[in-house]
Amino acid sequence: MSKEVFIGIDIGTSGVKILVVEKNGNIIANHTEPLGIIIKKPGWAEQKPDDWWKATKKGLIFIVNSLKPKNYEFLSIGLSGQMHSLVGLNIKDKPVYNAILWNDGRTHEECKFIKEQTGSMLGEITGNPPLEGFTAPKMLWL
């Protein structure tokens, strides 16, 4: 009889983390494929979106090879990752630039512009001021 398990994949800043877990929370396997950060200028932080996909595939292959897949029934896959990172796509859904990460600080001037244009309204509506790590200032920068 096969064990029912779940796969969790977290595409994080430092790496793609993959976990296989049983219903009771027992961890069957885990693996991390490291990712690098591209720093072109002080305060900038980028990654190549294709590297996320390559690391995910490599990690899943590692996990499957470390298990005997016929002994497991994979019930679902959960995904998370790259909150507030921006990936601009062309008309063919291909990245036009590296992903600008959540911890990138290049959008200081764009944040000032948003604050000037919205005053306190943005913070009152969203509960957040415009911050360099958020997506809207990055879109203005592009």
Which residue stretches match the model-derived regions?
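Glycine-rich phosphate-binding loop and adjoining helix at the ATP-binding site
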Residues: 57, 87-141
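N-terminal glycine/serine-rich phosphate-binding loop of ATP-dependent small-molecule kinases
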Residues: 1-97, 124
